Each structure stands twice: as structure tokens, then as C-alpha cells.
């Protein structure tokens, strides 16, 4: 790395002064994001604050935004998904707080009476409260 590392640290420091973004060098990426060690993640990560986007200034049509974003920090309530379920396995009219999407796989496996053939991070026990009965 050498000179490139010095420039990277300077760029990181400069970007940290920009409002409405979080800036992380690869080794600073929070573990809770689960991609710190992914080969697709490069040396610098920027995450926009909720309601903000990071855009290329070379947009050929600056009067309109012609892209999409990948969302924001997954701990933000606005990034949580909606889950609606109906059927004989579910309590009628039941509502609960948000839960992690990783728990949907064990739920679907349970409903289909399938046993996952590998270790998974999801856990049916964390979301079984909306089922009529637990086996």
C-alpha cells in the first residue's frame, strides 16, 4: 500500500468532515454490518444518513436523479421490512414489533415441515409468538 495508504487516510479524514455521511476505512466497518471481510467491500465505505444520497457530480441530467440507492443503516426503523401473514398457522389480528429477516427462513421451513440442511443464523423461537401453537 505505501503512498496509497497515506492518500486513503487523508481522503477518509477529509470525507469525515462532510455532513450527513458516515465514513469507514475497511478495518473500521462495524461488525454489525456483516460485510467487513467481504471481498466486494473496498478500502473505503460511505453510508449516507437517512434521507440523504451520495451522488456522482457528473450526472448528465442534473435536473433529475436517475438512479437508486441501496438504503441506509439497517438499524434505522425506516429500513425495517413489513411482514404480513395470514393462514391457519398464524394468530388472527396479531401485531408485534419488528424482527430480523433472518428469522423468516426458519419460519417458512417450519410451516412447510422442512428441516434446514445447514446451520443458519435465523431462529424460529424469536418469532414464534405470532404462531397459533408451537411444536
What are these regions (language model features)?
Residues 1-95, 99-107:
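Active-site neighborhoods of enzymes that stabilize oxyanions during catalysis
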Residues 104, 119-135:
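Long, internal low-complexity/basic segments
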Residues 16, 20, 109-117, 132:
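Sec-exported extracytoplasmic/periplasmic mature domains
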Residues 25-27, 118-121:
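Surface-exposed patches in mature extracellular/periplasmic domains of secreted proteins
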Amino acid at each position: 500500500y505505501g503512498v496509497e495508504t497515506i492518500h486513503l487516510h487523508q481522503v477518509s479524514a477529509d470525507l469525515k468532515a462532510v455532513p450527513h455521511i458516515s465514513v469507514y476505512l475497511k478495518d473500521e466497518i462495524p461488525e454489525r454490518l456483516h460485510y467487513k471481510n467481504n471481498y466486494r467491500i473496498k478500502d473505503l465505505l460511505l453510508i449516507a444518513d437517512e434521507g440523504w444520497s451520495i451522488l456522482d457530480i457528473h450526472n448528465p441530467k442534473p435536473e433529475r436523479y436517475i438512479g437508486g440507492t441501496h438504503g441506509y443503516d439497517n438499524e434505522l426503523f425506516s429500513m425495517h421490512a413489513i411482514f404480513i401473514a395470514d393462514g391457519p398457522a398464524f394468530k388472527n389480528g396479531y401485531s408485534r414489533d419488528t424482527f430480523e429477516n433472518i428469522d423468516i427462513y426458519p419460519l417458512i421451513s417450519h410451516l412447510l415441515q422442512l428441516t434446514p440442511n445447514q446451520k443458519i443464523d435465523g431462529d424460529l423461537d424469536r418469532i414464534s409468538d405470532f404462531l397459533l401453537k408451537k411444536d
